[in-house]
Regions:
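Helix-adjacent hinge/juxtasegments
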Residues: 63-101
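N-terminal, charged amphipathic alpha-helical interaction modules
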Residues: 38-70
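Short, conserved charged micro-motifs
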Residues: 20-21, 62-67, 108-112, 145-146
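Short, hydrophobic beta-strand segments
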Residues: 8-14, 51-58, 95-106
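N-terminal, positively charged regions that mediate nucleic acid binding
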Residues: 4-40
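Short amphipathic beta-strand starts and helix->beta connectors
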Residues: 36-43, 82-88, 113-125
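Positively charged, low-complexity, intrinsically disordered RNA-binding extensions
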Residues: 5-6, 10, 46, 99-170
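Short amphipathic alpha-helix segments
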Residues: 22-37, 71-72, 109-121
């Protein structure tokens, strides 16, 4: 007979904190404006929060790479996972400058969610995994199984940043 005890559960999410990104962008711009090697490069970093994008621009690819390095260092300092960034191709912009768009990953894409669910199912642990919009919910009777699933997921690389939230225990 099924017990009426509610399941323990947690959510697997992928979220980037935009206020932290905003801070990192401001700090990166400050450093870029002070750097002698980037002085005349007309470099810029613009966060477009509504689009979950960062736009980078600089006078050439070499300087754009330097701008990216500065930004990444500032993001790491603010605990923003670099795995949560997807880099578009470098394209020509106005004049002789180049630009690049970075997309901030918010939510788990359906293909990735399916891979995560499959890994959990194949592990034969006594849990259920279900896709709920842009997150995956894992539930099970015993907490140890949930802990094992977390360990399993930490060891797997889906090429995305994942966090475990909404841990509910009975």
């Amino acid at each position: 007979s099924k017990s009426t005890m509610p399941d323990n559960s947690f959510d697997i999410v992928s979220k980037i904190e935009l206020p932290e990104v905003s801070n990192a962008v401001q700090q990166a711009m400050k450093e870029i404006q002070q750097r002698f090697d980037l002085k005349d490069s007309h470099s810029s970093i613009e966060l477009r929060e509504k689009e979950n994008k960062i736009l980078l621009q600089s006078s050439d690819e070499f300087k754009l790479k330097a701008v990216t390095d500065v930004l990444q260092a500032k993001l790491v300092k603010r605990s923003v996972p670099l795995k949560g960034l997807t880099y578009g191709t470098v394209t020509p912009a106005t004049g002789s400058s180049v630009r690049q768009e970075i997309t901030l990953q918010q939510g788990i894409a359906i293909e990735k969610a399916r891979e995560i669910v499959k890994l959990i199912k194949d592990s034969k642990k006594k849990v259920q995994a279900s896709i709920q919009g842009d997150l995956v919910r894992v539930s099970g009777k015993d907490r140890d199984s949930l802990q094992e699933v977390m360990a399993l997921l930490r060891g797997a690389d889906f090429g995305i940043d994942m966090q475990f939230t909404n841990y509910r225990t009975n």
